[in-house]
């Protein structure tokens, strides 16, 4: 069905955009050569698709009915082989004709990514970690990675034949590689931008015509989903046709689109299990001379065998560690397994692409840039990720600091992202930090995306000095909510049974502290349990806690079913404490902390520092 959809999209686009010489060739074929009830539409489409795989003059074409024989030879593998075509009713036949009556000529190939994402079920999209990338976000990656430099080179080459020739030759020797290409959005945008730069230079030096040198065969990708893989290949073909039309409009030279050239550089597979160099080789010419050239490209007598420039980019799947399958965790572990850092199991899935990208460009002039979650630039993920990168003598060339992910797709990703560019370490090269509409030139960028050297703050469970009291995880009830009281419930219980107040304490976590929400909890010591059970409301709640824990899947929770009056994890001390929320807004310059009295239990949604003197609070809230 995936191949069928790709073939349909191509035919609709081809009949409206001039790929097929006859306008409405495909739609008219459906209207005139098939029964109105749709009974023979399947067979007729199979015949038409087969014809588009037959070269001109082949014996098989002679036996084709006239209605189907008008279809040209397409090639490229799009119509190669028999693939399932669904059966049609009169209603579905009409829907197909209605689709053909739309004008597909000016369709933006970028929207196929949006369309693909809308077709994927939300649960599958979550499993794959797929997020469609809009053109503005794509340009945040491509411009600092290579486009800005190519634009500067194009400006220097305009009107100067020798420079222009060298520039065009350079363009033909670049490889562009997206190892998580999805439906091809990054590759399509990159292809269009590079072709337009080429046109600008050729316009200024007509002697270098007749034909362009940049080809879709310079664009490489890996995609794990078969439908997205088909759409990526199709979109590149359509994008090439659009740019050929633009080439004709600007330079008056017509470049034939058909027959399509095979494009086997978009590989179907798992990028974390494939050898990237087998997909995008580092050696040999990036492409042979284009099929349409009448003479060797730019008068060259032999193909260029220089080592190509390679740029790797993309928006890999995010998937936090808790969302990953066992197989996905193993894939990340295989990449970072030799790291001296702990907590490899907590790495986001996107870290796999960062690691393999660093491995690919190590010791070479190649560069890479990826959209990633901002998690890899903060907290415990920094150690294992950046240990691997820095050991390969790689540095950050540019970075976009945290921004909310937005696009035009139906399903928004709902994450905060960064963009990170990597290159071989240079002594005198400058780096750039982008923040909203501002850009700052710096000597070096730290793994926290601030100006500075590659220093990593290591995870530790112990204070840096014995003078600091320990910070501990808050107390976790695992009670099904039965040991916790809202402010209203607290007053109801206390008003009914005054003696219950001796078993109740204030209960505060991140939300309670930041928002000022008032909650309470039952906090009962073992020696108090017999007295506490005399109170009906407490006895009722303890029975519910016991039942909840017995039914738990966690052995550690079930072990406390016979002690329902206790929190399963207890850190509380009857002293004043500092509360440090585990989660707060990223827009805050400081983590909101505060002092709590000895009668407040800090929950597991926050951290606690007990017996802390005022100077400890001062250091914790300092930006030093």
Map each language-model feature to its residues.
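Secondary-structure capping and boundary motifs in well-ordered enzyme cores
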Residues: 1-2, 37, 41, 107-111, ...
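Preference for the N-terminal adenyl/adenosyl cofactor-binding alpha/beta module
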Residues: 1-189, 193-195, 218, 222-231, ...
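Hydrophobic/aromatic-lined pockets within catalytic cores
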Residues: 9-18, 34, 50-53, 120, ...
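S-adenosyl-L-methionine-dependent nucleic acid methyltransferase catalytic domains
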Residues: 12, 163, 169-171, 193-310, ...
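Signature of N6-adenine DNA methyltransferases within the class I
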Residues: 18-42, 47, 54, 136-137, ...
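Glycine- and acidic
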Residues: 95-103, 118-136, 171-181, 213-222, ...
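Conserved, well-structured core segments
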Residues: 114, 351, 418-421, 506, ...
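Flexible, glycine/threonine-enriched loop-and-boundary segments that flank and lead into catalytic domains
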Residues: 124, 158-175, 262, 275-311, ...
């Amino acid at each position: 069905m995936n191949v069928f959809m790709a073939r349909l999209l191509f035919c609709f686009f081809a009949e409206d955009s001039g790929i097929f010489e006859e306008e409405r060739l495909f739609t008219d074929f459906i209207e005139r050569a098939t029964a109105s009830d749709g009974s023979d539409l399947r067979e007729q489409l199979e015949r038409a698709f087969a014809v588009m795989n037959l070269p001109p003059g082949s014996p098989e074409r002679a036996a084709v009915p006239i209605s189907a024989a008008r279809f040209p030879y397409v090639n490229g593998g799009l119509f190669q082989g028999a693939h399932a075509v669904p059966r049609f009713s009169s209603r579905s036949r009409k829907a197909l004709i209605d689709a053909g009556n739309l004008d597909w000529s000016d369709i933006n190939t970028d929207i196929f990514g949006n369309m693909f994402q809308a077709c994927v079920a939300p649960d599958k999209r979550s499993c794959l970690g797929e997020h469609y990338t809009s053109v503005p976000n794509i340009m945040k990656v491509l411009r600092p990675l290579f486009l800005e430099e190519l634009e500067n080179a194009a400006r220097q080459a305009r009107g100067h034949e020798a420079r222009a020739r060298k520039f065009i030759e350079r363009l033909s020797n670049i490889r562009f590689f997206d190892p998580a290409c999805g439906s091809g959005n990054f590759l399509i945008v990159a292809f269009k931008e590079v072709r337009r730069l080429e046109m600008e230079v050729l316009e200024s030096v007509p002697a270098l015509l007749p034909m362009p040198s940049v080809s879709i065969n310079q664009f490489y990708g890996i995609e794990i989903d078969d439908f997205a893989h088909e759409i990526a290949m199709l979109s590149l073909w359509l994008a090439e046709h659009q740019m050929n039309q633009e080439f004709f409009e600007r330079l008056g030279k017509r470049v034939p689109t058909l027959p399509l050239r095979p494009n086997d550089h978009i590989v179907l597979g798992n990028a974390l299990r494939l050898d990237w160099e087998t997909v995008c080789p580092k050696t040999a010419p990036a492409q042979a001379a284009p099929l349409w050239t009448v003479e060797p490209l730019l008068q060259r007598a032999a193909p260029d065998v220089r080592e190509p420039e390679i740029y790797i980019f993309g928006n890999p799947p995010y998937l936090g560690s808790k969302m990953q399958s066992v197989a996905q965790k193993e894939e990340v572990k295989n990449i970072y397994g030799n790291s001296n850092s702990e907590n490899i199991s907590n790495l986001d899935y996107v870290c796999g692409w960062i690691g393999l990208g660093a491995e690919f460009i190590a010791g070479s002039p190649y560069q890479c840039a990826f959209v990633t979650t901002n998690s890899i630039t903060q907290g415990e993920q920094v150690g294992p990720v950046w240990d691997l990168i820095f050991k390969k003598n790689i540095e950050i060339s540019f970075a976009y600091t945290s921004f909310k992910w937005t696009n035009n797709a139906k399903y928004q990703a709902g994450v905060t992202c960064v963009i990170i560019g990597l290159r071989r370490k240079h002594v005198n090269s400058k780096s750039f930090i982008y923040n909203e509409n501002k850009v700052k030139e710096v000597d070096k960028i730290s793994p926290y995306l601030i100006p500075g050297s590659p220093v990593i703050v290591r995870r530790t469970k112990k204070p840096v000095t014995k003078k600091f009291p320990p910070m501990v995880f808050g107390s976790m009830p695992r009670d099904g909510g039965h040991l916790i009281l809202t402010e209203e419930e607290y007053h109801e219980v206390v008003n009914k049974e005054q003696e219950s107040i001796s078993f109740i304490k204030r209960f505060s976590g991140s939300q309670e502290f930041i928002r000022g929400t008032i909650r309470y909890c039952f906090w009962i010591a073992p020696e108090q349990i017999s007295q506490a059970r005399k109170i009906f409301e407490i006895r009722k709640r303890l029975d519910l806690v016991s039942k909840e824990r017995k039914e738990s899947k966690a052995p550690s929770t079930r072990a406390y079913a016979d002690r329902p009056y206790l929190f399963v994890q207890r850190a509380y001390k009857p002293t004043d404490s500092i509360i440090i929320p585990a989660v707060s807004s990223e827009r805050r310059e400081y983590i909101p902390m505060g002092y709590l009295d000895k009668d407040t239990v800090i929950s597991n949604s926050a951290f606690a520092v007990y017996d802390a003197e005022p100077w400890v609070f001062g250091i914790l809230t300092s930006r030093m």
